[in-house]
Amino acid sequence: MSFLQRLIFALVFFICTANAQEHNSETGAEILLPFKQELQQALLGGLADGPEQAIDVCKLEAPEIATSLSQNGILLGRASDRLRNPLNTTPEWAAPILESYTNNPENREPQHVSLSENRTGYVEPILIQPVCLACHGTELSQSISTKLNLAYPADRATGYQTGDLRGIFWVEFVE
């Protein structure tokens, strides 16, 4: 399987999530879908030019995508317990879910949380796919390591294996 085929497979898998049964979870999944799709397209474009370009996508384009979709009472993003980008901190309400996903790998279903003022939070896990290992794995190329060290001096987002929990997608919205 070529690199591009593996990449496409991994990114398609990346945006697919289990169907949640409750209305709030379905709404959360629907709200997150455009973010995941736009991020996927941006990563595909970056990876087509090499893994080093994907670093720029994650650093520059992903926050812009999240900001552009965070409107009309919707806030969304990505977070992790092992941050690469210090701006991707976990919202306080999502921290217990991230901790649960981290400590209970068998229970990583999407979850919703009732928040104050008729707001709902929704969280989905982000799992490491084979193509992610170029930038998040245990053995990084010298060019990737150099670029990561320059872009993210306090990077903690390496050392993963396929299937590991990378972090979460989260969204907060009005019910």
Regions from the language model: what does each represent?
Residues 129-139:
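The canonical Cys-X-X-Cys-His
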Residues 7-16:
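Bacterial N-terminal signal peptides
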Residues 1-6:
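Positively charged n-region of N-terminal signal peptides that target proteins for export
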Residues 21-129, 143-175:
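Extracytoplasmic c-type cytochrome modules immediately beyond a signal peptide or single-pass transmembrane anchor
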